[in-house]
């Protein structure tokens, strides 16, 4: 669905749904059946007709009220992001999260409180295990514009050359920064072999270090001259399989903006699936061959992991 050339008359839909906070059991709307789904519609934002609901898992993370990183909803209570985003402070009270945000800066959405931050115990300053999760004080209720992203099964990685998308606000061309306010964007990238990635970054190797890009990382190259840049940290790298979006990576770092010779580096989510499950702790497996047959009540409060040919409800 493209909105750019559509006449804005008659497209003034209601404002984006804010997260509804509640302590009662969740009852999802009839449109919700799994993770990794989109509900695209057109809306006038700052005088322009834009697509909304295209990346409903995307969240903005704020430190003392200022945007610092992106993240993604993986659970009613939990947000996935990069560990280096949370180095400013270990105090969860300093962080808040906004969901359902289309443009930055955003003054219309409520800031959701964070009760705990979990940084991977082996995290080393972008070089390894750059992954973290935030726990929200109150559960987020799904809506057409606020939904979770799927996570891959353990150690599953997309094939080399697969086209995926990086989602976030810190995406730009090699020259020229985006003007604010600007909308959440998605740019196409292709998966690059880690060995090629290591060769490109060999000048960064320390003495006696054999490789720079480990198995816990993924690499991509820009498809159309656009790539991750500043403020993109923590954003999701998503790939579509069987009409379902799966988060394969978390933006970690890159060398410059949009330089094809220097791939962008991501934390591989499949490498940390078990770690995420251990941290959240309330997970239960349930195989489902046909996700739409599941009751909305069953979906309540869990993460969805995806394997090829089936979905896994945790």
Curated annotation (Swiss-Prot):
GO cellular component, one term: membrane
One Pfam family named in its UniProt record: Trypsin
Active-site residue numbers: 84, 130, 233
BP GO terms, sorted: proteolysis
Top-level taxon of the source organism: Eukaryota
GO molecular function, one term: serine-type endopeptidase activity
Membrane spanning residue stretches: 293-313
Protein's UniProt keywords contain Protease: yes
Localisation: Membrane
Residue pairs linked by disulfide bridges in the UniProt entry: 69-85, 164-239, 197-219, 229-257
Protein name per Swiss-Prot or TrEMBL: Serine protease 46
Record gene name: Prss46
